[in-house]
């Protein structure tokens, strides 16, 4: 037993970037067999000298979360026990709380939150708008086939505009008057030959991009008045819109589209590739080959990394800046079935959420590949889409006809304040 | 006499020891002659002698040549002497005296020369004394270095020519007056022997009598000279015969390690020595050849051989190495089989439980004819005492059997081939290197309420269609597992097949006796509409169909209520349809009705709404049919065999022999050269159509009947589904190189289907693009493995 633990004592330096939790930078000798709990007690004891209340911390050892015993962690990383080890501690991200369950008539395949509204797309061909308090505002029929993706174009006090795509091969541009609670279909975007599976609105909200099963990536104008003259008059009246740009390059269905910046698009496809498109060049800037079909890909503006969900149980982290191609930065194991959807936090640099066919959502820290931070349970069926656009709420829709809302309890606002 | 001596000069000793000796002898002979002359009887017939001499000379005339060959120096001299002889012969008749004088002259001159070599006289003695020659020692004459070596040498015969009978015991001639014969075959008369008185008188009168001896060979008397006597005396006193000999002469080392400036002999080298010898060259070349051919060995080799022979010698301890039998018996004896130890039953007084009861006895008797089946080979018996045990009744028979065993027992141990089992397994690549292939179950499509018979994937890979025994056809979205549409039919759905042409949106559904062409209304709306238009109305056909086809098949548009479900065309068959399969272009489709006898396989043409019955005769119970992906070929599987027909030429191309009892399914490689066949007797057969009509490989991977088998369109993969609930995914690489055989590696066994009523997996089908496989099972589910 002694030999097993027998690494004896390890010298550690405790550091933090959160100033108000700082402890004096002196080396502490601690047992090698300690885990997070013991470290927490120890650190809290140190802090209590300063009269602070008890806080839960997570410990980062060499840029990776400490999950088991310290000695195991060090052994795995092949770090000598003789060295003084720097342990960075951060306040533990508080567990998101299930807040609401929004019941639908059919599978919910698309969710998007913005402000206090939640937009959902449903397999019964309707779009629904909910408040984040769980109040159903509106059901919008219009599509003739299941909705596959929705996205907000703009939202203000008076009007909300959003776009929805569906298996009926169209994308629809909607304008919603909040006060009168009336919704208008501004235009129908026709051009795709198969189901439109993904949509993304450009940062300036002037354009949006759709990816479809017909392998095409199409760009559309998001203006209320389509700036096409003359011949499009008739089309405008009928509300039919044609793509501004069509980008061909994928060999299979495009399952994920995201704007990286005003002129750069990220797409993920079933043909096992991630592509970064430059809209000025109208071509491919970077291509990352993977070995699985990609179901979802998400790019973080904070750390400029891409996390993908593909046809297996793992989430993978890619760096689009590397030239070597498919360098997987990290693999996140935890789900038990296909991961269908993934999204970075818009405020926390290291956090992202994922939804999987094993009926679970998981909240991950990208520095903790072995285990997620939290499992967000609640769904009784496959999770089809997840959204964390609103930092306060994690919203996911699933095949159990519900949308689950989890309140991300950590007041990101607080966090901002501390910064 | 003079002539005789002259002739004698020519004669040389054939066995002359050396030059010097011969020279001295010759010179001595001359002296002897004088001596002999003196004792000679005056009355002797000289002519006779002459003749003998001549004869003798002619006999040895060859030696003359020899002599001259030996020493070139003699040549001139000999000629001179011969000239002398000639001269002598001429004068023969004229004047004997002259000759004598001549002789004397030469003799004196010889004597002069002899003076220098006094030892020569001693040598003469040996000749003259004949028998006593054993004491004669040839003394090398001391040469005067100032004189040329062979200056004075001339040879003459030293043989006693008066003896013609040779060296024989002379007493043989005691009774005769003569000794031998001369040239003219006349007797040579012995010299007269005086009586004792004469001897006595001579002893008194002759002062030299004491030194007169008789030559035993010739019987003549010889007068010994003073030198002879001195020599005899010296020999008798065991001194060195030559008085001149100085025993203590200073030693001159003639042959030393020192190289002298001047040659030892001052005779110039002969011309011959400067010329390369031809014969020597021949000899050398012969030796070189012999060396090359290995007939001859160099001295080094010979030396080495000798050295080796001298080294330690090894020899066989036993006779040979190959005579293994002898050694084997020592090292590796075949041990006799061990007999069981005797048990209680074998005792003469066994405990009662070992004795047979009635049941055991009955069993014993039952195996009367097959005694080897009995548990015991004897019947336990009980005796009161050992005395009562009878003699062993089967003794003789047992001996006989033992002998028989010995006769048949193996004499040598059978050598087992010691091959490592690993070695026999073909080297297959590791499955890890053959990725991607499905490894885990990813999705389960639930919704059917009875066993799902068939599944087919949309060519683009977004949807699947499944047909079930619950009389429904369901269309599913692959990625989410959502059932998009359920189409109810009137009968059990045996087979569904999505049209492989991506430009058409049709599903062929075999339900009962009807084949439904359904528009699934998924995917591209434009295609859906186009397909609807295409199927809306029947093209006018002017071909009159034969009665045979009419009774078998009827085409009709669907009823309005079925139209709503998506059914567009109904092809009603006369028997239940079991299988439907499309041609790659999507215009033709073939159906199988196992009960249709000679009309069990049908080919329908969609665009013309026509049906054909390709076969007029039934070749067996048709199980399934298949279109070749590239060529106009048609595969028909009956229970046991597969026939390949050319649809254009309408003839049988090939018949594949499966050697199995019941074929369940077929799948053809997208390139069209390899065919996979699944059978109900647990086998999967891989046919290389270019190779032979027999299976290239037979795989027995499943534990139960194999229901279905399928090739992937893009990846080198195939999968099989079986009643043992397993889907086995294998790697099946077909190489473009015709010389390389297909590589088959079983990769993964996927066993998640539940067993229901002895059925497991009923159908397998690959996703057209992804390495994903769909399997349908008796547990009412469709499962996706990725």
From Swiss-Prot, chain A:
Region (Ubiquitin-like (UBL) domain): 10-91
Gene Ontology cellular component list: nucleoplasm; PeBoW complex; preribosome, large subunit precursor
UniProt cross-references to InterPro entries, sorted A to Z: G-protein_beta_WD-40_rep (IPR020472), NLE (IPR012972), WD40/YVTN_repeat-like_dom_sf (IPR015943), WD40_repeat_CS (IPR019775), WD40_repeat_dom_sf (IPR036322), WD40_rpt (IPR001680), WDR12/Ytm1 (IPR028599)
Family membership: Belongs to the WD repeat WDR12/YTM1 family.
Gene3D superfamilies hit by this protein: YVTN repeat-like/Quinoprotein amine dehydrogenase
GO biological process, one term: maturation of LSU-rRNA from tricistronic rRNA transcript (SSU-rRNA, 5.8S rRNA, LSU-rRNA)
One MF annotation (Gene Ontology) recorded for this entry: ribonucleoprotein complex binding
Principal place of residence: nucleus
Protein function: Required for maturation of ribosomal RNAs and formation of the large ribosomal subunit.
Keywords, alphabetical: Nucleus, Repeat, Ribosome biogenesis, rRNA processing, WD repeat
Localization: Nucleus, Nucleolus; Nucleus, Nucleoplasm
Organism listed in the record: Drosophila grimshawi
Pfam families: NLE (PF08154), WD40 (PF00400)
WD repeats: 103-141, 142-184, 191-230, 249-287, 289-328, 334-374, 378-416
Cross-referenced PANTHER family: RIBOSOME BIOGENESIS PROTEIN WDR12 (PTHR19855:SF11), WD40 REPEAT PROTEIN 12, 37 (PTHR19855)
The protein's name: Ribosome biogenesis protein WDR12 homolog
UniProtKB/Swiss-Prot annotation, chain B:
Subcellular location: Nucleus, Nucleolus; Nucleus, Nucleoplasm
Feature: compositional bias, Basic residues: 1-11
GO cellular component: nucleoplasm; PeBoW complex; preribosome, large subunit precursor
Chain segments carrying region Disordered: 1-161
InterPro entries: BOP1/Erb1, BOP1_N_dom, WD40/YVTN_repeat-like_dom_sf, WD40_repeat_CS, WD40_repeat_dom_sf, WD40_rpt
PANTHER family: RIBOSOME BIOGENESIS PROTEIN BOP1, RIBOSOME BIOGENESIS PROTEIN BOP1 BLOCK OF PROLIFERATION 1 PROTEIN
HAMAP family to which the protein is assigned, alphabetical: BOP1 (MF_03027)
Function field: Required for maturation of ribosomal RNAs and formation of the large ribosomal subunit.
Protein known as: Ribosome biogenesis protein BOP1 homolog
Natural source organism: Drosophila grimshawi
């Amino acid at each position: 037993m002694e030999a097993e633990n027998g690494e004896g004592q390890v010298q550690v330096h405790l550091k933090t970037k959160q100033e108000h939790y700082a402890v004096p930078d002196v080396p502490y000798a601690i047992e090698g067999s300690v885990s997070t709990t013991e470290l927490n007690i120890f650190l809290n004891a140190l802090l209590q000298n300063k009269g602070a209340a008890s806080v839960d911390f997570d410990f980062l050892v060499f840029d990776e979360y400490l999950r088991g015993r310290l000695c195991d962690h060090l052994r795995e990383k092949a770090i000598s026990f003789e060295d003084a080890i720097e342990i960075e501690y951060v306040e533990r991200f508080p567990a998101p709380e299930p807040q609401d369950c929004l019941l639908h008539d059919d599978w919910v395949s698309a969710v998007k939150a913005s402000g206090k509204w939640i937009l959902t797309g449903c397999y019964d061909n309707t779009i629904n708008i909910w408040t984040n308090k769980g109040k159903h505002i509106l059901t919008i029929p219009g599509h003739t086939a299941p909705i596959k993706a929705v996205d907000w174009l703009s939202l203000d006090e008076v009007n909300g505009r959003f776009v929805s795509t569906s298996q009926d091969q169209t994308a629809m541009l909607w304008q919603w008057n909040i006060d009168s609670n009336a919704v208008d279909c501004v235009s129908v975007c026709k051009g795709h030959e198969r189901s439109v599976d993904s949509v993304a609105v450009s940062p300036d909200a002037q354009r949006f991009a759709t990816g479809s099963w017909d392998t095409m990536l199409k760009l559309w104008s998001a203006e209320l008045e389509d700036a096409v003259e003359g011949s499009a008059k008739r089309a405008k009246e009928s509300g039919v819109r044609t793509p501004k740009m069509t980008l061909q390059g994928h060999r299979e269905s495009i399952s994920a589209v995201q704007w990286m910046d005003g002129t750069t698009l990220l797409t993920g496809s079933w043909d096992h590739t991630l592509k970064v498109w430059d809209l000025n060049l109208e071509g491919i800037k970077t291509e990352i080959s993977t070995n699985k079909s990609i179901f979802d890909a998400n790019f973080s503006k904070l750390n400029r990394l891409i996390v993908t969900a593909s046809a297996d149980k793992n989430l993978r982290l890619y760096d689009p800046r590397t030239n070597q191609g498919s360098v997987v930065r990290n693999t996140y194991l935890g789900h038990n079935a296909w991961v269908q959807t993934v999204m970075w936090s818009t405020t926390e640099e290291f956090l992202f959420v994922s939804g999987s066919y094993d009926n679970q959502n998981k909240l991950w820290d990208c520095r903790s590949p072995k285990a997620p931070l939290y499992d967000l349970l609640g769904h009784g069926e496959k999770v089809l889409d997840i959204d964390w656009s609103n930092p306060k709420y994690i919203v996911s829709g699933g095949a159990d006809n519900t949308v689950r809302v989890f309140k991300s309890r950590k007041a990101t606002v607080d966090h901002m304040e501390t910064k | 006499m003079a002539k005789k001596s002259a002739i004698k000069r020519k004669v040389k000793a054939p066995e002359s020891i050396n030059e010097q000796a011969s020279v001295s002898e010759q010179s001595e002979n001359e002296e002897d002659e004088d001596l002999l002359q003196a004792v000679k009887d005056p009355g002797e017939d000289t002519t006779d002698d002459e003749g003998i001499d001549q004869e003798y000379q002619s006999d040895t005339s060859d030696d003359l040549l020899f002599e001259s060959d030996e020493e070139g120096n003699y040549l001139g001299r000999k000629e001179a002497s011969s000239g002398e002889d000639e001269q002598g012969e001429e004068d023969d008749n004229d004047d004997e005296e002259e000759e004598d004088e001549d002789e004397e002259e030469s003799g004196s001159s010889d004597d002069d020369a002899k003076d220098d070599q006094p030892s020569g006289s001693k040598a003469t003695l040996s000749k003259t004394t004949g028998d006593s020659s054993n004491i004669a020692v040839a003394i090398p004459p001391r040469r005067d270095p100032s004189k040329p070596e062979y200056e004075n040498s001339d040879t003459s015969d030293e043989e006693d020519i008066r003896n013609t009978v040779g060296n024989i015991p002379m007493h043989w001639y005691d009774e005769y007056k003569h000794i031998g014969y001369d040239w003219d075959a006349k007797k040579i008369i012995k010299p007269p022997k005086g009586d004792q008185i004469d001897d006595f008188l001579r002893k008194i009168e002759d002062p030299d009598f004491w030194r007169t001896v008789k030559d035993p060979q010739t019987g003549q008397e010889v007068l010994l000279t003073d030198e002879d006597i001195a020599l005899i005396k010296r020999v008798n006193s065991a001194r060195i015969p030559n008085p001149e000999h100085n025993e203590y002469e200073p030693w001159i080392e003639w042959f030393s390690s020192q190289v002298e400036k001047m040659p030892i002999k001052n005779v110039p080298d002969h011309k011959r020595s400067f010329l390369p010898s031809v014969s020597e060259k021949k000899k050398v070349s012969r030796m070189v050849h012999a060396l090359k051919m290995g007939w001859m060995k160099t001295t080094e080799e010979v030396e080495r051989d000798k050295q080796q022979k001298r080294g330690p010698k090894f020899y066989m301890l036993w006779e040979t190495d190959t005579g293994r039998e002898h050694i084997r018996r020592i090292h590796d004896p075949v041990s006799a089989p061990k007999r069981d130890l005797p048990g209680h039953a074998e005792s003469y007084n066994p405990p009662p439980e070992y004795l047979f009861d009635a049941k055991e006895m009955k069993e014993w008797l039952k195996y009367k004819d097959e005694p080897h089946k009995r548990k015991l080979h004897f019947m336990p018996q009980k005796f009161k005492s050992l005395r009562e045990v009878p003699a062993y009744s089967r003794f003789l028979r047992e001996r006989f059997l033992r002998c028989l065993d010995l006769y048949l027992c193996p004499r040598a141990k059978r050598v087992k081939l010691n091959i490592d089992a690993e070695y026999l397994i073909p080297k297959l690549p590791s499955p890890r290197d053959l990725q991607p292939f499905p490894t885990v179950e990813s999705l389960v499509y639930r919704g059917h309420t009875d066993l799902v018979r068939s599944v087919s994937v949309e060519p683009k890979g977004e949807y699947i269609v499944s047909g079930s025994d619950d009389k429904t056809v369901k269309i599913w979205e692959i990625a989410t597992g959502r059932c998009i549409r359920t189409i109810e039919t009137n009968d059990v759905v045996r087979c569904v097949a999505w049209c492989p042409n991506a430009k058409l949106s049709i599903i062929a559904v075999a339900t009962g006796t009807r084949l439904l062409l359904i528009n699934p209304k998924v995917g591209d709306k434009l295609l859906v509409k186009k397909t609807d238009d295409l199927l809306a109305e029947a093209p006018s056909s002017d071909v009159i169909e034969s009665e045979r086809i009419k009774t078998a098949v009827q085409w009709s548009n669907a009823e309005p209520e079925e139209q709503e479900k998506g059914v567009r065309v109904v092809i009603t068959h006369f028997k239940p349809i079991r299988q439907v399969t499309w041609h790659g272009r999507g215009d033709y489709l073939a159906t199988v009705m196992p009960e249709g006898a000679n009309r069990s396989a049908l080919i329908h043409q969609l665009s013309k709404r026509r049906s054909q019955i390709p076969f007029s005769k039934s070749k067996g119970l048709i199980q399934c049919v298949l279109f070749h992906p590239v060529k106009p070929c048609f595969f028909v599987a009956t229970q046991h065999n597969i026939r390949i027909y050319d649809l254009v030429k309408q003839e049988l191309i090939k018949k594949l022999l499966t050697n199995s009892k019941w074929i369940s399914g077929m799948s053809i490689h997208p390139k069209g050269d390899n065919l996979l066949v699944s059978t109900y007797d647990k086998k999967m057969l891989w046919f290389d159509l270019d190779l032979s009509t027999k299976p290239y490989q037979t795989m027995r991977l499943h534990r139960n009947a194999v229901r279905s088998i399928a090739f992937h369109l893009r990846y080198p993969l195939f999968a099989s589904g079986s009643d043992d609930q397993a889907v086995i995914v294998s790697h099946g690489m077909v190489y473009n190189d015709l010389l390389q055989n297909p590589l088959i590696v079983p990769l993964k066994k996927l066993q998640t289907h539940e067993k229901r009523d002895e059925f497991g997996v009923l159908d397998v089908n690959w996703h057209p693009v992804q390495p994903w496989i769909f399997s349908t099972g008796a547990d009412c589910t469709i499962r996706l493995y990725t």
